[in-house]
């Protein structure tokens, strides 16, 4: 979102808010390779283990979790336009934690959009390999209430940004497999 400064990175006055978004939708069955539950697992293992308070080698077992998700699968146009669900994870969470829910909703005819709330997520890995670490541990901070309010306001703005991008996807202004397949009246 080039219109918002990133307040989690006060050391970089030019930093703009970035979001990582993952999408599930009704798709044509195919034999393409299924996506892993977590991308960049080696990068994520340490922070997942810290959040869960268990040894990091346990987190490496997450690679055994199988999904039904396929990258860029053709849209199943039957049932379109699709109602939309936007998933917002909890503090230290991440978009992939809701994969089974998102897959189920997509199998029922929904387009599901889940984001990492950057710096509130356990760790965000962007397509270029850059990382946004978790920066929301403010327990005991004297201004924790006002900081949490700012975080919630940021999350609301994240969702509003995604909603605006959905309009661009639907219209074709932003190229995406779901161009023309979204029901913007059912979010």
Language-model-derived ranges and their functions:
Residues 24, 85-87, 181, 186-187:
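Extended hydrophobic secondary-structure segments that form protein cores and membrane-embedded regions
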Residues 23, 105, 159, 187:
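Divalent metal-coordination and catalytic microenvironments
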Residues 67-125:
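Short substrate-entry loop that stabilizes the transition state in hydrolases
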Residues 1-85:
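Domain-level recognition of soluble alpha/beta enzyme cores
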Residues 119-186:
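Alpha/beta-hydrolase active-site loop
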Residues 17-18, 96-99, 103, 153, ...:
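A structural signal for well-ordered alpha-helical segments within the folded catalytic domains
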Residues 19-22, 47-49, 110-113, 136-140:
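Glycine-rich loops and low-complexity Gly/Arg-rich segments
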Residues 25, 107, 164-168:
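Residues at helix-coil transition
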């Amino acid at each position: 979102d080039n219109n918002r400064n990133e307040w989690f990175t006060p050391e970089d006055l030019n930093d703009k808010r970035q979001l990582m978004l993952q999408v599930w939708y009704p798709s044509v069955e195919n034999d393409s390779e299924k996506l892993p539950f977590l991308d960049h697992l080696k990068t994520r293992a340490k922070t997942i283990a810290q959040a869960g308070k268990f040894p990091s080698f346990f987190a490496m077992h997450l690679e055994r979790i199988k999904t039904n998700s396929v990258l860029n699968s053709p849209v199943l146009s039957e049932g379109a336009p699709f109602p939309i669900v936007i998933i917002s994870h909890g503090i230290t969470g991440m978009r992939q934690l809701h994969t089974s829910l998102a897959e189920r909703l997509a199998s029922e005819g929904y387009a599901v959009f889940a984001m990492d709330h950057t710096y509130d997520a356990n760790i965000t890995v962007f397509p270029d390999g850059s990382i946004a670490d978790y920066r929301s541990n403010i327990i005991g901070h004297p201004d924790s209430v006002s900081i949490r309010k700012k975080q919630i306001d940021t999350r609301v703005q994240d969702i509003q940004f995604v909603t605006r991008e959905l309009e661009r996807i639907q219209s074709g202004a932003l190229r995406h497999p779901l161009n023309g397949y979204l029901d913007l009246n059912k979010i």
